[in-house]
Amino acid sequence: MKEQNESFVVDFVGGAVGHRFRSGEGRGQALPKAAGFTKGRTPKIVDATAGLGRDAFLLASLGAEVTLIERSPGMHAHLADGISRALEAGGAYAEAASRMTLLQGDSRQLLKELSPEVVVIDPMHPPRHNTALVKKEMRVLRELVGSDPDQVELMEVALAHATKRVVLKWPLRADPMPGIRKPSHQIIGKNTRYDVFMIFGNSLDQQE
């Protein structure tokens, strides 16, 4: 994301996102592993808290069809602009962006209609003064998106309607989300952990 005076643009081609894309770290990264990517399997994913769209773009660049849901009209407009410019950039950027479908609305309602295989949820967390969350872009994002007081309800809806798994992106040392069952397993990143909730009843998922 590039800053422009008092505003910003979502940028999937340049900056940190472009660097991450060009590095080609692939399916071995923590998020793709948590989402169920394997050598021969690419899941269909709903990013229920799209935000900056970075995670969705990473997953789309690895071949997944990703539906992004953003309830903030302002953030939705920034995401639409970012996807449009990635399409215009051509090549692998356009290929990844072509797999991204952007919806504006409340994930708690839309998930019931989509019945997704995999849901990724990254709630807005309280700011931590010694992390990148104090950066201007994150402050602006917080102003656009606000807090997520309904994050527990969103998790409950996701667990009720996902067909394979739900992935909760959570601060590494934070307590578990209250009121939600224990995750099936966790994938640990540098500063983040991914709590993975398998939706049992699918024999393939139970073997993963």
Swiss-Prot record:
Spans through the membrane: none
Main location: cytoplasm
Protein encoded by which gene: rsmJ
UniProt name for this protein: Ribosomal RNA small subunit methyltransferase J
Keyword Methyltransferase carried by entry: yes
Reactions this protein catalyses: guanosine(1516) in 16S rRNA + S-adenosyl-L-methionine = N(2)-methylguanosine(1516) in 16S rRNA + S-adenosyl-L-homocysteine + H(+)
Pfam family, one: SAM_MT
Enzyme Commission (EC) number: 2.1.1.242
Family assignment from sequence similarity: Belongs to the methyltransferase superfamily. RsmJ family.
Residues engaged in binding S-adenosyl-L-methionine: R54, D55, E70, R71, D122
Keyword annotations from UniProtKB, A to Z: Cytoplasm, Methyltransferase, rRNA processing, S-adenosyl-L-methionine, Transferase
Subcellular location: Cytoplasm
Described function: Specifically methylates the guanosine in position 1516 of 16S rRNA.
